[in-house]
Swiss-Prot record:
Plays a role in hippocampal-dependent synaptic plasticity, learning and memory. Involved in the formation of spines and functional synaptic contacts by modulating the translational activity of the cytoplasmic polyadenylation element-binding protein CPEB3. Promotes ubiquitination of CPEB3, and hence induces CPEB3-dependent mRNA translation activation of glutamate receptor GRIA1 and GRIA2. Can function as an E3 ubiquitin-protein ligase to activate monoubiquitination of JAG1 (in vitro), thereby regulating the Notch pathway. Residues 1-41, 491-511 are annotated as: Disordered. Pathway: Protein modification; protein ubiquitination. Induction: Down-regulated in medulloblastoma (MB). This is E3 ubiquitin-protein ligase NEURL1. It is a peripheral membrane protein. Expressed in brain, testis, pituitary gland, pancreas and bone marrow. Also poorly expressed in malignant astrocytomas and several neuroectodermal tumor cell lines. Weakly expressed in medulloblastoma (MB) compared with normal cerebellar tissues. It catalyses: S-ubiquitinyl-[E2 ubiquitin-conjugating enzyme]-L-cysteine + [acceptor protein]-L-lysine = [E2 ubiquitin-conjugating enzyme]-L-cysteine + N(6)-ubiquitinyl-[acceptor protein]-L-lysine. Keywords: Cell membrane, Cell projection, Cytoplasm, Lipoprotein, Membrane, Metal-binding, Myristate, Notch signaling pathway, Repeat, Synapse, Transferase, Translation regulation, Tumor suppressor, Ubl conjugation pathway, Zinc, Zinc-finger. GO terms for cellular component: apical dendrite; dendritic spine; glutamatergic synapse; perikaryon; perinuclear region of cytoplasm; plasma membrane; postsynaptic density. InterPro entries: B30.2/SPRY_sf (IPR043136), Neuralized (IPR037962), NHR_dom (IPR006573), Znf_RING (IPR001841), Znf_RING/FYVE/PHD (IPR013083). It comes from Homo sapiens. Pfam families: Neuralized (PF07177), zf-C3HC4_3 (PF13920).
């Protein structure tokens, strides 16, 4: 046989020394392929010779990706060695250009990772010739859609193995068992039940957080070297039967299994959400393309706060430490939507997340400069605006935050608009900050995107954000401060600000007849707001508290921190 690859398929069919099979060989299914083998009913060795070449022998044709049969989102380079998913999280099934041999390692290098999705590569084999498969007939997912058809076997690679730069090798042995190896680690049993009587093509689904892969030169594994210790330990009853139970284990690959870094944890109550469904939900909350240059700053407050995964993940190692504050590595841009995902929640109870912006460059601060509570940041001399996400948060939730040209910070929660949360001065550089509270112990920056104002469906402006009357204008300036931000324990002390330049003075709510007179003073929380601070024009104090604050040393506005030159009492017209 030598290296003549064309003789490989004839090996299992042309061996006269083997006994005939107990089932017909000429039956075809609706796709034109053979029916699944029922060899699991017989507990003896398979009665065929798998296509195994002598040691060191590989086909002359290199192993490449099939140039035509691929998912609609796949982009392939001219060498047919590298593929990339251009958008979404699915429609990225690929095949090898030729059948692989028994014990031939299919070696892949992960070249691109996109952390906003759940799940990773799906790897396996098929006995169907990809040249006879129309690309339009390929389903979105290898698991469970493709593996539910005869002649396809695949399983999900655990997420902790799907890091950029990792080299994954997988192969099938003569007993239909599939093994994999990550880099130079030990050989692990992946799944079993592959029918080796027919030629097998490699199947690679560039799914979920795996965005791009590259095929490396294949190698043969010597059978004598395949004695992984983990095989005996991992051989569960569900792996003893080779056909039906393999189907079951492959279908279960669609379940959401938490990774080592705690990402994509399933909800605490009820059944785990399948990754396909979870990603479909996320795709409604995320744009097709995300920029990945935004990271967390190295500065963090809290002895147990860690910045991980190329500075995209902030984790609190011990939930008892409430001093958990992190910043973005650069100022956010106007109209740039920042997407953040809650990737770990420490219990069934919902947690809380503070967010805000500051004009203070984190690079000029030390951890000791930061207060114990994020809401106490407003006592610093720089501009800080902080509040908490309204409503409960759970693992898997995605938040979108954007500061528009008017200085309004809008929030979306899983694609649903939550309205304007803060008013800030968009003319200055603004770093975003996050504070983790309670059971929220890990967040991840998924990326960012700049969309046109009318092109942000997940972040529509609330009615209060486009005021046309003095009453509406007063609502815009006071709602984020006194209503929305009061969802946190000290939220009212961490309000937002309108632009504090002189040109913003005409927009200050100084007109009688405002609709928010029932709002409480941010100092005493007893009397209604009835005082305008000069020169910034903010209304957040009662007259008595305003007088006391004005007499204080270095008196400044609680919102924008500008010096207080005077206070003006206002009266409501009857």
């Amino acid at each position: 046989m030598g290296n003549n690859f064309s003789s490989i398929p004839s090996l299992p069919r042309g061996n006269p020394s083997r006994a005939p099979r107990g089932h017909p060989q000429n039956l075809k299914d609706s796709i034109g392929g053979p029916f699944p083998v029922t060899s699991h009913r017989c507990h003896h060795k398979q009665k065929h010779c798998p296509a195994v070449l002598p040691s060191g022998g590989l086909p002359a044709t290199p192993l490449l990706f099939h140039p035509h049969t691929k998912g609609s989102q796949i982009l392939m380079d001219l060498s047919h060695k590298a593929v990339k998913r251009q958008a979404s999280f699915c429609n990225a099934i690929t095949f090898s250009n030729r059948p692989v041999l028994i014990y031939e390692q299919v070696r892949l290098k992960i070249t691109k990772k996109q952390c906003c999705w759940s799940g990773a590569l799906r790897l396996g084999f098929t006995s169907k010739d990809p040249s006879r498969i129309h690309p339009d007939s390929l389903p979105k997912y290898a698991c469970p859609d493709l593996v539910s058809q005869s002649g396809f076997w695949a399983k999900a690679l655990p997420e902790e193995f799907a890091n950029e730069g990792n080299i994954i090798a997988f192969w099938v042995d003569k007993k239909g068992r599939v093994f994999h190896r990550i880099n130079d680690s030990a050989v692990m049993l992946f799944f079993s039940g592959v029918r080796t009587a027919d030629p097998l093509w490699a199947l690679v689904d560039v799914y979920g957080l795996t965005r791009g892969v590259q095929l490396l030169d294949s190698e043969l594994v010597l059978p004598d070297c395949l004695r992984p210790r983990s095989f005996t330990a991992l051989r569960r009853p569900s792996l003893r039967r080779e056909a039906d139970d393999a189907r079951l284990s492959v279908s279960l690959c669609d379940l959401n299994v938490p990774g080592a870094d705690g990402d994509e944890a399933a909800p605490a109550a009820g059944c785990p959400i399948p990754q396909n469904s979870l990603n479909s939900q996320h795709s409604r909350a995320l744009p097709a393309q995300l920029d990945g240059d935004l990271r967390f700053h190295a500065l963090r407050a809290g002895a147990h706060v860690r910045i991980l995964d190329e500075q995209t993940v902030a984790r609190v190692e011990h939930g008892r430490d409430e001093r958990a504050l992190v910043f973005t590595s650069r100022p956010v841009r106007v109209a740039e939507t920042i997407f953040v995902k809650v990737t770990r929640s420490g219990g069934a109870r919902p947690g809380a997340l503070s967010f805000g912006v500051t004009t203070c460059d984190p690079g000029t601060l030390r951890p000791a400069d930061l207060p114990f509570s994020p809401e106490a940041l407003v006592d610093r001399k720089e501009f800080w605006a902080v509040c908490r996400v309204p409503g409960p948060l759970h693992s898997g939730d995605i938040l979108g935050l954007v500061v528009n040209a008017d200085g309004e910070l809008h929030l979306s929660h899983n694609g649903a608009a939550a309205g304007m949360q803060l008013c800030v001065d968009a003319s200055q550089p603004l770093w975003m900050l996050f504070g983790l509270h309670g059971t929220i112990t890990q967040i991840r920056i998924l990326g960012s995107t700049i969309l046109a104002e009318r092109g942000i469906p997940s972040l529509p402006c609330s009615p209060a954000s486009t005021p046309t009357s003095p009453s509406a204008l007063g609502s815009r300036l006071s709602d984020p401060l006194l209503s929305t931000c009061s969802s946190g324990p000290l939220g009212s002390s961490a309000g937002g600000t309108a632009p504090n330049s002189p040109v913003s003075l005409p927009e200050s709510p100084v007109t009688p007849g405002l609709g928010q007179w029932s709002d409480e003073c941010t100092i005493c929380y007893e009397h209604a707001v009835d005082t305008v601070i000069y020169t910034c024009g903010h209304m957040c104090l009662c007259y008595a508290c305003g007088l006391r604050l004005k007499k204080a040393l270095h008196a400044c506005c609680p919102i924008c921190r500008r010096p207080i030159k005077d206070i003006i009492k206002t009266y409501r017209s009857s």
